[in-house]
């Protein structure tokens, strides 16, 4: 066991009093685990590394855990020849990510603003695809694919379909950042001299292709997609924003934090999207810019939590120095994503083999988002009869965090701290097999994968054992009642 649990155990002696089983002395045990303030390394949430795994990220301090590796690649890199996915490349990245204890999220890009480094495949022009010339601002001439051209569009839609056939539901694939359209796949062609955004119908077909190809893996739409944000979230997508922290870096009279994000969500009817699908943040510039400009970290982080973010991507840039920065980051990362606290657990101290064991537990999500994966709460008995795992009927995806009113007039002036979610009471009636050998059993709790009962989520309590379970009590199994 990594840490001997310091549990406040209240044993109320209720022998033959509280509906005790005939012939079996029982106490009602109430366990109150000790909460931890540790930053937890949990799947599908938290700090993202950028184009490198956490093992390769020299700017990742040891006190920040990371379970997600984020990257973006050009269409041409992922389909170097017509009809040929770069599976060797993607499989290698997935394997490196898995070895680092992370999952992978990525975006596909078609339009590059870097001269002589296009994102579209070199073969696209050779097969008759229409390529257009433009400039990014006052820069040199660039080639970008015309997604409104039927040949280009059909080739790209087929690429997305095959990408999903190969990788949808891959255990190491965390989510897809729905890209393809606009500069860098960011759904805009700002400062393009000659090439506008593709037609609305083309954009819709690209969104449909991603949502059809990736039905098991979550898909996130960039918040700047405007009409396509509305369209995507109505069909199950989450959303992503790539300029968290902009408090005036582009204009003294306008910024993303006060004048765009909340308003865009309202317009797209996406305010409650977080309840069913994830929200991802990427920093505008990186956090060093925020500190150098004197922008409030507390404001930015409270805002990100209030909009129920699950991820933060600082592009693997160096962090700003100073103990006050670390303190704010620690406070933020303790809350980012889901965070489950077991507040109390009640059970009787003894039960007959072949009988029913009732466990009542109270849980609270003190994070900023739900867990979107179908992991399940389970209990483990370990004793003379070996190991027995008993699943709960609870759906942990319904354990919601607290909320604040983001439309309150004062929210954009000073976002308040996100409150914890409401406590959730779970009552499980577990059937004990009649053949289970009598004796004293350790009772452990965990949140596990349904297919193999392996614990996957760290709880915000102390006392996790080496196997990932949390042994918190004991129960005596008596021989089967005659």
Which ranges hold each PLM region?
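Substrate-binding cleft/loops of secretory-pathway carbohydrate-active enzymes
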Residues: 182-208, 213, 220-270
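Sec/Tat signal peptide C-region and signal peptidase I cleavage site
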Residues: 21-25
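Bacterial N-terminal signal peptides that target proteins for export
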Residues: 2-11
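Extracellular/luminal regions of secreted and cell-surface proteins that mediate adhesion/ECM remodeling
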Residues: 333-482
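Non-catalytic accessory regions flanking glycosidase/transglycosidase catalytic cores in CAZymes
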Residues: 26-70, 75-99, 103, 152, ...
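An active-site-proximal structural segment forming one wall of the substrate-binding cleft
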Residues: 93-98, 130-177, 202-209
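Bacterial N-terminal signal peptides
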Residues: 10-20
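N-terminal substrate-binding region of glycoside hydrolase catalytic domains
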Residues: 27-151, 270-324
């Amino acid at each position: 066991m990594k840490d001997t649990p310091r549990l406040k155990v209240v044993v109320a002696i209720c022998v033959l009093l509280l509906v005790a089983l005939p012939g079996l002395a029982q106490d009602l045990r109430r366990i109150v685990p000790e909460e931890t303030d540790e930053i937890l390394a949990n799947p599908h949430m938290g700090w993202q590394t950028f184009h490198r795994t956490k093992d390769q990220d020299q700017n990742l301090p040891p006190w920040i855990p990371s379970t997600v590796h984020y990257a973006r690649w050009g269409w041409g890199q992922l389909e170097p020849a017509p009809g040929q996915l770069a599976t060797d490349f993607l499989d290698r990245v997935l394997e490196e990510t898995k070895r680092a204890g992370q999952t992978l999220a990525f975006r596909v890009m078609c339009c590059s603003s870097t001269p002589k480094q296009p994102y579209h495949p070199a073969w696209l022009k050779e097969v008759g695809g229409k390529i257009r010339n433009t400039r990014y601002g006052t820069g040199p001439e660039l080639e970008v694919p015309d997604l409104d051209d039927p040949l280009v569009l059909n080739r790209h839609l087929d690429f997305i379909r095959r990408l999903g056939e190969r990788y949808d539901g891959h255990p190491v694939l965390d989510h897809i950042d729905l890209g393809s359209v606009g500069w860098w796949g960011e759904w805009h062609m700002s400062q393009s001299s000659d090439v506008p955004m593709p037609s609305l119908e083309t954009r819709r077909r690209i969104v449909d292709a991603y949502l059809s190809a990736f039905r098991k893996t979550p898909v996130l739409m960039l918040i700047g997609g405007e009409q396509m944000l509305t369209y995507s979230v109505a069909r199950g997508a989450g959303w992503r924003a790539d300029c968290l922290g902009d408090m005036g870096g582009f204009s003294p009279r306008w910024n993303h934090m006060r004048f765009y994000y909340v308003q865009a969500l309202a317009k797209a009817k996406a305010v409650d999207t977080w309840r069913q699908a994830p929200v991802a943040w990427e920093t505008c510039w990186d956090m060093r810019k925020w500190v150098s400009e004197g922008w409030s970290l507390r404001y930015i982080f409270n805002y990100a939590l209030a909009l129920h973010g699950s991820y933060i991507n600082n592009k693997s840039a160096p962090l700003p120095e100073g103990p006050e920065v670390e303190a704010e980051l620690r406070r933020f990362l303790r809350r980012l994503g889901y965070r489950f606290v077991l507040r109390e657990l009640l059970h009787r101290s003894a039960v007959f083999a072949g009988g029913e064991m009732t466990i009542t537990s109270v849980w609270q999500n003190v994070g900023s988002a739900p867990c979107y994966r179908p992991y399940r709460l389970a209990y483990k008995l370990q004793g003379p009869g070996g190991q027995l795992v008993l699943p709960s009927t609870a759906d942990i995806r319904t354990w919601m965090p607290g909320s604040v009113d983001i439309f309150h007039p004062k929210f954009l002036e000073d976002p308040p701290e996100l409150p914890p979610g409401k406590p959730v009471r779970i009552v499980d009636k577990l059937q004990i097999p009649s053949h289970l050998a009598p004796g004293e059993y350790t009772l452990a709790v965990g949140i596990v994968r349904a297919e193999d009962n392996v614990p996957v989520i760290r709880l915000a309590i102390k006392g996790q054992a080496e196997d990932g379970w949390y042994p918190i009590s004991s129960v005596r199994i008596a021989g089967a009642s005659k």
